[in-house]
Amino acid sequence: MGAGQVSADRHFFDDLGADSLVMAHFCARVRKRADLPSVSMKDVYRNPTINALAAAVAAPAPAPPAEAPVPPPAAAAAPAPAGTPEYVLCGALQLLAFVGYAYLIALISTWGYTWIAAGSGTFDVYLRSVLFGAVGLLVLCAVPILVKWVLIGRWKPQQIRVWSLSYVRFWVVKTLVRTDPLVLFVGSPLYTLYLRALGAKIGRDVAVFSRNLPVCTDLLTVGDGTVIRKDSFFSCYRAHAGVIQTGAVVLGKDVVVSEATVLDIGSSLGDGAQLGHASSLHSGQMVPDGEHWHGSPAQRTDVDYRAVGPAGCGAWRRTVHSALQLLAVLLVYVPLAVGGVGVLLAEAPQLTAVLEPGPTALTDWMFYVRAVAASLLFFAAVPFGLLFQATVPRLLSRTITPGKVYPLYGFHYGVHRIIALTTNRKFLTRLFGDSSGIVHYLRRCLGYDLSRVEQTGSNFGTELKHETPYLSSVGTGTMVADGLSIVNADFSNTSFRVSRASIGPRNYLGNRITYPSRGRTGDNCLLATKVMVPIDGKIREGVGLLGSPSFEIPRSVQRDSTFDELKSGEQLGRLLSAKNRHNAATMALYLVVRWLYFLWVTLLVAVAAELYDTLGAWTIALGNVLVVLSGAVYFVLVDRAVTALHPLTPLFCSIYDLRFWRRERFWKVPSESYLLIFNGTPFKNVIWRLLGVRIGRKVFDDGCYLTERSLVTIGDGCTLNTGSVVQCHSQEDGTFKSDRSTIASGCTLGVGAFVHYGVAMGDGAVLAPDSFLMKGEVVPPHAQWGGNPARQTGGRDAGEGWR
């Protein structure tokens, strides 16, 4: 800090003006000194003077508590890394599998549409649509289950080298079971029935609300009466040092697994046990019967996370609900989707012409004019979506009484699911997020209670979700980054209840926060990234909260007040107007970019129809493949175009700085959705490279997200698990900070791990699941770090790692 000699009793943050980045560098320097004990960021926050810190690290380590995690059994020697021929062969086989499945879908679809089109009259077409829809749905649901049992049989604890032939089988099964239409029935008895069909041992009266479907289902055991809430990971596998490791996850009877949790392989919860939100069980951790744990890694607590009591929800109710869901799909949704295309072709001769032999509409320039005109209907989706959201869900919400306990799988449950589905539209939230428009969208369209709004132009980010918007309150002057999940509905295995979730005024919320309705925070709080919001104890006010379980830190530091003079007066009005103009242009670009892709897909469909008589179903299959591949190329070009004139660089500026507005444009205009289909394939590395990531050879990426691609460096042979994030920026109140992060060769990021900006991980380092590696941290080579905030938990890893 350049402060020279200071008193040993001076406060790091209050007196010396330090911040978390400075103290992370301080901790890294201390760890390099062999004559000094290791210190972590948590030690610094809890002991914010030199005297207090020295006394804390000099004290003898306390005896391990009774609930300390059980160390995992020693792993077998890791297989040797795959060579280049295996890497190339794996990618080729994955591409062939994708094309083959696309052909199967095209074959079934074209046969079905031909048969439906031969119907006479509307009713006959409808009946044929229902029959074809039923058969098609049965095939799409059954194929992944059949493939799993044929290629794998029963999953067993094992190690699978990535890019090997065994891994190709693993990838095929993982991809198919996660794209099965039955996944759409999450929160329904049909979902647990699907898990049973895949080999999972699921007890009676179990409710699963997480869309993160487990893959190695034979290794999953869930006892009677257990509830697994949304955004939880319990995949029964993980990737580590270039190897897929499968292992058991065991949940006893009447277990509660709260929102945004991670259950690593080899973890378990006993009968009646509870795991709090934003928590994780690492490999080897076992929660005894009846105990409550929370944190990352979890530790014992007295907090009760069973927020709602039971209700009558017997087998008859579950059966009727499942039957009604299937009937709705077969009698309404599928006929609309299948028969609607036939009706469209029948009523639009200019489109029907492309199916006729000989000269077709594709040779007429007016066809393309009509195609462009038809594609302009894309823009009508925005006002229609806003009108629908402002009316239908609001009317439905009147049927549900806050605070009242309702049984699952009844009328009120169905209404609540419709409200949650229709008001959480990512397209619109991303459109209005990071702009002044977001507060009007949330308040007027969705029904949020935002008190008296203090417009900043960045009140909310582009990612936000809730259970119901009508019971979501955010106080005056509060700013929210991306990834906030407002949990204002509590679920048991038989019941649910909605209640108001209130975030106080003058708060700042970081990224990836799950905020429960029982949250105990009030005015003027800083909620750090991935913090576990407390639901017990006093109301926290005027403090910051960090970690899981959370502990208090300073609400703000000197560095974050650098641009406070811009927050008021005439200067604010002038800068806010300029920001609004820039954000409006960004929103227009967002819509135009997606409209152009929509137009391109429309033309591809037309060309496929033109060539159908010549090539048959292969035309449709290749058209589907081209939609995916050309979409990737298109959005890579969009990404590069946005940053062509203004490349991403480390920043320290106000949110009213033009450089920050350009960064907001970079976050909004490109798309990342297309990346999902490339997870676990060599093609993901190619795309990262095209997007500007400095990435090494044979990196295994199972679903990592990089917010600022060109600021990230990833070394050879790294392993990036699903749900992991490398975010090269941070924002506290009105101050924006950004820097580069480096993940050296052979590193592993666990499931749900979060890496902040300015971080350097040494060769072969491991970051445990659900960990938060804070800004500026330096992880030594081959070290094992974990926790929230992360700290060193072990030395050189036992595996061979990257060679």
Regions inferred by a protein language model and the residue ranges of each:
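Short amphipathic alpha-helical segments with coiled-coil-like heptad repeat character
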Residues: 107-110, 338, 515, 533, ...
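Residue-level signal for pocket-adjacent positions within structured domains
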Residues: 1-2, 7-8, 39-40, 176, ...
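Left-handed beta-helix
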Residues: 168-254, 258-267, 282, 395-506, ...
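Terminal amphipathic alpha-helical/low-complexity segments used for targeting or macromolecular assembly
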Residues: 73-200, 288-447, 540-692, 781-803
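Conserved structural-core and active-site-/substrate-pathway-adjacent residues in large, well-folded domains
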Residues: 16-19, 30, 53, 99, ...
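Phosphopantetheine-dependent thiolation modules in NRPS/PKS and related acyl-activating systems
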Residues: 1-78
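Glycine-rich hexapeptide-repeat left-handed beta-helix
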Residues: 144, 221, 227-334, 469-589, ...
